[in-house]
Amino acid sequence: GGADVFGHRFDGYWRDVGPVEAYWKANLDLVGLVPPLDLFDRSWLIHTRSEERSPAKLGPDALARHSLVSHGCIVNGTVTNSVLSPGVKVYEGAVVRDSIILLDTEIGPGAVVDTAIIDKFVHVGAGAVVGSGDDRATPNVDEPDRLSTGITVVGERARIPAGARLGRNCLVEPRVEPEDFASFADLVVPTGASVRRAA
């Protein structure tokens, strides 16, 4: 009632990042050779509240390609077509592929993360696999409309136990502990399953 409404023509990059897959794609758009949103355009500065950290460090056996590796990251494994937020650690022998890893998460030695969104302060144990198998079509049992394209989502401060194996379209609730995986035989979480925090 009575308020003025104004429109503005915008020809720049825009994407609705509400759906999980759209958020994932928007982040991975940034690692392209000519990204639709140029983070290095000096005429369009990004003002952020990120804390000061040391530069990213790549170890002697590290390999990072087609990726954004933020300040404070330490990479001793392989990172491909991924976005690493500040403070992420990728340990020796670990592989991160087609994934978004948020603030201060640790990917343990020999772990594999493939096609995932991992929230901040998560620990992925040694030798664990997040996003395994070829079945990208079986939707998540709890979020079938949101997780049905092969992306596995891990919530904030979750702890994935060493040797665990999570399929595609899995959902790991925030603050899940290793003992919350006890109901899965041999720590294998099938595609489309959810890991809940014990009450």
Please place each PLM-identified region on the residue numbering:
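Left-handed beta-helix
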Residues: 1-199
